[in-house]
């Protein structure tokens, strides 16, 4: 076992939520260690965020109404109040004053409007807002005397002691030439999960590869509460390809139209807000029209696309897409609205453990996330959790970490790839945009068997790939089980058998 490291606050993840937690804790004088499994800390979901970050401007109540409406009755008003109450100050203090993010606008900020927003309130930088936030954030933290950063350091498991989380075990692949190490214990006064999303559970996702739900899985296995796992959001307009890229909501906000293979605009038939309807509505409509006619394209002719969205125009050119004839789009996995249950400062049900960002269920999003609120939620909850974690002033409490097998990076050829193919196939086919009770039961059976195979193999060796497979299987099971236990459609959880279940004589029994 490698010598242990101690720190006041351990942050697992280097996106906007993890950076926010690290900044707030460091400002309180705490020692902070940020560990990310990415080879570069900037390889986080935040860096892929396009559209922007919503703020309240001078009307927090209208943002609250829009969030609650998008959440389809499942959002927590107290959590939404916390978000809109902190929004303006957090954006101004951190993003504008501290980091100097170059938001678009020559004289003042250029606020954009996106789907399901009643007003223009979204700050953006081209269609690469996350990239322009995360780079300055990481550089600022790297220069902070209270913050240390570890890249290519994956958390394998949380360390617990009598119901409290006392740190985590890391798998390290240092770039310095030092030997790789597995089972490196880091003991912390408080641990903050900021591990991002679950995109690797699906064949097509807007998330970076490696988004295997690690924080949700580790927390669940340690005994933390996980809620609303069924609410997996599918973005309606990703490039229709095996390797998709996101076509930001902001493009529709500027006037782009959705047309089927017959050239017909169809969204007015599905919702009064047409292309600016909530994401779940647009995603199901796009899927239906694509199934019926063979293709859906985003018509960008109503706007000066290359001038307003040069990054997206370049992405189209790189793929050989002639955007002047429309961009082929289809829904793909985008965001987990549920996750590790937390309160308004990011506390989980386990002592000393916090969760922020996409791995957390704050209650803000309910059954469906409003466009451009993920960066804001990550920032606000990161700041709240970091300040609270540092304020707890708990000394690291070294305890006995779980024993790991010898490190074995050499899995049988194709082992991890084959298991992930099976997992993604069952998630796509049975736990996707449209669901039935029978499909969800089938998925649970396959995922249980897959997890059993991975667990059996892991009894004799340790590998980062094995732990990521385990995490993906655990989270897949949590999603399928929650979806199966919720027969009512809401937001991005759509039960296509709901009407039949309501008509059946034994419904509800």
From Swiss-Prot:
Record-listed FAD binding positions: 14-17, 45-52, 214, 358, 374-375
Region (Disordered): 389-412, 486-509
Site keyed Important in orienting the L-aspartate substrate: positions: 114
Pathway(s) annotated for this protein in UniProt: Cofactor biosynthesis; NAD(+) biosynthesis; iminoaspartate from L-aspartate (oxidase route): step 1/1
Acidic residues: bias regions: 499-509
EC main group: oxidoreductase
Record field: catalytic activity: L-aspartate + O2 = iminosuccinate + H2O2
Keywords: Cytoplasm, FAD, Flavoprotein, Nucleotide-binding, Oxidoreductase, Pyridine nucleotide biosynthesis
A GO cellular-component term linked to this record: cytoplasm
Cofactor note: Binds 1 FAD per subunit.
Keyword Flavoprotein: yes
UniProt family annotation: Belongs to the FAD-dependent oxidoreductase 2 family. NadB subfamily.
The protein's name: L-aspartate oxidase
């Amino acid at each position: 076992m490698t010598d242990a490291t101690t720190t006041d606050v351990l942050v697992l993840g280097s996106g906007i939520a993890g950076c926010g937690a690290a900044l707030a804790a460091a400002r309180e004088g705490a020692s902070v260690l940020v560990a990310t499994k990415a080879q570069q800390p900037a390889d986080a979901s935040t860096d892929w965020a396009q559209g922007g970050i919503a703020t309240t401007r001078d009307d927090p109540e209208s943002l609250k109404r829009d969030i609650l409406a998008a959440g389809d009755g499942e959002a927590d008003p107290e959590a939404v109040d916390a978000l809109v109450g902190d929004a303006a100050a957090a954006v101004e203090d951190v993003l504008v004053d501290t980091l100097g993010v170059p938001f678009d606008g020559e004289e003042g900020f250029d606020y954009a409007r996106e789907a399901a927003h009643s007003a223009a309130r979204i700050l953006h930088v081209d269609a690469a807002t996350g990239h322009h936030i995360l780079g300055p954030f990481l550089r600022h933290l790297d220069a902070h005397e209270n913050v240390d950063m570890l890249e290519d350091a994956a958390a394998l498991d949380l360390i617990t002691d009598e119901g409290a989380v006392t740190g985590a075990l890391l798998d390290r692949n240092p770039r310095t030439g030092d030997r790789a190490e597995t089972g490196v214990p880091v003991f912390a006064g408080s641990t903050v999960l900021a591990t991002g999303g679950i995109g690797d559970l699906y064949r097509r996702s807007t998330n970076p590869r490696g988004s295997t739900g690690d924080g949700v899985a580790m927390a669940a296995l340690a005994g933390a509460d996980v809620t609303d796992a069924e609410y997996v959001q599918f973005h309606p307009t990703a490039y229709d390809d095996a390797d998709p890229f996101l076509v930001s909501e902001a493009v529709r906000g500027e006037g782009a139209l959705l047309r089927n293979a017959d050239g017909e605009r169809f969204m007015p038939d599905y919702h009064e807000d047409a292309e600016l309807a909530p994401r779940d509505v647009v995603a199901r409509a796009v899927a239906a029209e694509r199934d019926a006619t063979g293709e859906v394209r985003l018509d960008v002719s109503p706007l000066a696309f290359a001038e307003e969205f040069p990054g997206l125009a370049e992405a189209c050119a790189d793929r050989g897409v002639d955007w002047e004839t429309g961009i082929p789009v289809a829904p793909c996995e985008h965001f987990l609205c549920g996750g590790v249950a937390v309160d308004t400062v990011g506390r989980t049900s386990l002592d000393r453990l916090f969760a922020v960002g996409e791995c957390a269920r704050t209650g803000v999003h309910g059954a469906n996330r409003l466009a451009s609120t993920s960066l804001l939620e990550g920032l606000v909850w990161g700041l709240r959790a970091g300040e609270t974690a540092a304020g707890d002033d708990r000394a690291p409490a070294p305890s006995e970490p779980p024993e790991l097998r010898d490190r074995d990076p050499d899995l049988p050829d194709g082992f991890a790839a084959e298991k992930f193919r099976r997992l993604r196939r069952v998630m796509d086919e049975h736990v996707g945009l449209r669901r039935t009770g029978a499909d969800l039961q089938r998925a649970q059976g396959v995922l249980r068997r897959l997890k059993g195979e991975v667990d059996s193999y892991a009894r004799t060796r340790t590998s980062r790939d094995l732990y990521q497979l385990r995490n993906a299987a655990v989270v897949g099971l949590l999603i399928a089980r929650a979806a199966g236990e919720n027969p009512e459609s809401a937001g991005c959880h759509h039960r296509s058998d709901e009407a039949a279940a309501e008509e059946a004589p034994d419904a509800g029994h």
